[in-house]
A protein has these predicted regions:
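Positively charged n-region of N-terminal signal peptides that target proteins for export
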Residues: 1-4
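N-terminal signal peptide c-region/cleavage motif recognized by signal peptidases
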Residues: 14-16
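Tandem repeat scaffolds
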Residues: 20-245
């Protein structure tokens, strides 16, 4: 038993039993707000929860497949290990939210305010972050392949070792973001602002960097082979051992 608990801990899986509050669940099912509630482990799949207030509520390990959180207040809520495939968070106020280890393929965060939220090791392949506020997010080792995040603001975001293969990031801002060793092969970063970004060992092979701005960025040991560098501006970026061909 001890060995099993150690294995679960190493995998980032909590051994705590998650039991939602029946009173909170009934409140939600009745169409009410649920501030600082406990919905951990609850199945809320496909429910329309749009426009409600869930600030500080615990959704850890909840099942939220295709759940509608559009225009909700979710500040300080927790979604650790939640299953959120195709969930909708369009226009949500979701600052300082914890999405650690959450699985949300195809989730829609268009126009959401996600500032200072934590996506550590979250799996969000194909999620939409169009025009989303992602300032100061923590997304180390997050799986963000094929996300659609045109015009999103990743300023000061922490994204080391993140997977962003084939991500659509046109006109996105990464000012002062940490993208150390991030995987951005075949990503579209045309017109993106990478000013002062930390991109040591970042993989940008075959990416589209047309009109992108890298002034004062750190590109040491980055891989830009076969990238589209049409009108790309490097300014004072450092490029020690950067691979261009």
């Amino acid at each position: 038993m001890k060995k099993l608990l150690i294995l679960l801990a190493c995998l980032g899986i909590s051994t705590t039993a998650f039991a939602y509050s029946n009173a909170d669940l009934e409140k939600v099912q009745a169409g009410s707000n649920c501030v600082n509630g406990d919905l951990s482990g609850a199945d809320l799949s496909a429910l329309d929860l749009s426009g409600r207030n869930f600030e500080g509520t615990n959704f850890n390990q909840a099942r939220l497949v295709s759940t509608n959180f559009n225009n909700t207040s979710l500040n300080d809520a927790k979604f650790d290990h939640a299953l959120m495939n195709n969930a909708k968070f369009r226009g949500a106020d979701a600052t300082n939210v914890s999405f650690k280890y959450a699985v949300g393929a195809g989730a829609d965060f268009t126009n959401a305010d996600l500032a200072a939220s934590n996506f550590y090791r979250a799996q969000l392949r194909g999620a939409k972050f169009l025009n989303a506020n992602l300032k100061h997010i923590e997304a180390q080792e997050a799986s963000l392949d094929s996300i659609i995040a045109d015009y999103a603001n990743f300023s000061n975001a922490n994204l080391p070792y993140a997977w962003m293969y084939k991500a659509q990031l046109k006109n996105a801002s990464f000012n002062y973001a940490n993208l150390y060793s991030a995987k951005l092969q075949h990503a579209d970063l045309s017109d993106a602002d990478m000013t002062s970004a930390k991109m040591g060992k970042t993989n940008l092979r075959s990416s589209i960097l047309a009109n992108a701005k890298f002034n004062a960025a750190v590109l040491d040991n980055a891989d830009l082979r076969n990238a589209d560098l049409t009108y790309t501006e490097f300014g004072t970026a450092t490029k020690m051992n950067t691979k261009f061909e």
